[in-house]
Amino acid sequence: MTLPASPPRYAVIGNPIAHSRSPQIHAMFSAQTGRPLRYERLLAPVDGFLPTVQAFRESGGLGLNVTVPFKLEAYALAEARLSERARLAGAVNTLSWRDGAWHGCNTDGVGLVNDLLRLGVALAGARVLLVGAGGAARGVLQPLAAAGCARIHIVNRTAARAAELAAAWRAAAPRTGTQVSAGALAQAAEPGGWDVAINATASGLQGAAPDLPGGLYAPDALAYDMMYGARPTAFMRQAEADGAARCADGLGMLVGQAAESFHIWHGVRPDPGPVLLALRTELLAAG
C-alpha cells in the first residue's frame, strides 16, 4: 500500500510571528488554485534565523516568507542567488529552495504596485511622494520605477537618510525615466501636488502620522498607507483633511505580496480579490 505524499511545506518566519495572517492567506490561495500545501508560522529566536531555516529545510521545507527582523539575514543567505528586485531592495522576503540552494526575492513592491493598479491609479507618468527611508521604502522603489512613475520624492524625518537612499538607488539601479529625489518632511510639498503619496513609515503603530506640511495633493490624488487596520490610519485621516481625493491602507499590499510569493513557488498566479475581501470583512467585524 502506498501512503499518500505529504503536501509541500512552506512557512512564514519572524519574531514575533503569532500575528501573521500569511497562513490564512496561503490557505485561501491553495483552495482557490487547487494546489495542496502545508503552511505554518515559524518563530525563530532573534539570534537563531539560520538554524531555524536549516531545520525547516531538513524537514522538507521548500519556501519561506520572511518578516521582521530577518529580511537582511535572508538576503545574506541567498546573496549569490538574488532576483533583481531583491538586489535593489537590499532585503529578501521570499526564499525558494531550488537546485540545492536558497534563492531570494522581494515581493513587497510588486504587492504595492499591483494594489495601486487595482485601485485605478495611473502610475505611468505619476509623481509619487514616498514618506520614509527605511527598508519598506527601499523595497518599493524598483517596482514603482518599473511601473513608469515620472518622479519619486523620498522624504524622511532625518533628511540625510532620505538622501542616502536616493543616492544608493541612483548608483545601483538601471537607468530609467524615473527621477528620484530626496528631502526632509518639511520639504514634501510639490507645485501642483503629488498624484500618489505613500506612507512607508511605522508611525501608525503609535497611532500617529508623519509631520508633513499641508497642500500636498493633486486634485485626483491617492494617499496610501502601508499599515492597515479596521479603521482609517492616522496618515489616511491626515491626508483626507489635506484634500486627498482617495485614501487606502496596506491590506491589499499584504495580499498582493503573498500572491506574488505563491506564484514564485507554485507557478500559478492566484486572484487576490476574494482573499482581500475576506480579510477586510474579518477586520471590520473584529473592529
From Swiss-Prot:
Purpose:
Involved in the biosynthesis of the chorismate, which leads to the biosynthesis of aromatic amino acids. Catalyzes the reversible NADPH linked reduction of 3-dehydroshikimate (DHSA) to yield shikimate (SA).
Q: Which HAMAP family match?
A: Shikimate_DH_AroE
Ligase recorded as keyword: no
Biological process (GO) annotations held by this record are: amino acid biosynthetic process; aromatic amino acid family biosynthetic process; chorismate biosynthetic process; shikimate metabolic process
Task: Please identify the protein, giving its name as recorded.
Answer: Shikimate dehydrogenase (NADP(+))
Lineage of the organism:
Bacteria, Pseudomonadati, Pseudomonadota, Betaproteobacteria, Burkholderiales
* Gene behind this protein: aroE
Could you tell me the EC number(s) of this protein? 1.1.1.25
**What pathway is it annotated to?**
Metabolic intermediate biosynthesis; chorismate biosynthesis; chorismate from D-erythrose 4-phosphate and phosphoenolpyruvate: step 4/7
One Pfam family from the record: Shikimate_DH
Provide the active-site residues from the annotation: K71 (proton acceptor)
Q: Which domain of life is it from?
A: Bacteria
Sites where the protein binds shikimate: S20, R21, S22, T67, N93, D108, Y228
Q: Specify the species.
A: Bordetella pertussis (strain Tohama I / ATCC BAA-589 / NCTC 13251)
Query: Which InterPro entries does the UniProt entry name for this protein?
Result: Aminoacid_DH-like_N_sf, NAD(P)-bd_dom_sf, SDH_C, Shikimate_DH, Shikimate_DH-bd_N, Shikimate_DH_fam, Shikm_DH/Glu-tRNA_Rdtase
Query: Its quaternary structure?
Result: Homodimer.
Give GO terms: molecular function aspect only: NADP binding; shikimate 3-dehydrogenase (NADP+) activity
From the UniProt record, list the reaction(s) this protein catalyses: shikimate + NADP(+) = 3-dehydroshikimate + NADPH + H(+)
The record's comment on protein family reads: Belongs to the shikimate dehydrogenase family.
Q: Keywords for this entry?
A: Amino-acid biosynthesis, Aromatic amino acid biosynthesis, NADP, Oxidoreductase
For the protein in the UniProt heading, the enzyme class is oxidoreductase
- Which Gene Ontology cellular-component terms appear in the entry? cytosol
UniProt binding sites for NADP(+):
E84, G132, A133, G134, G135, A136, N156, R157, T158, A159, A160, R161, M226, G250
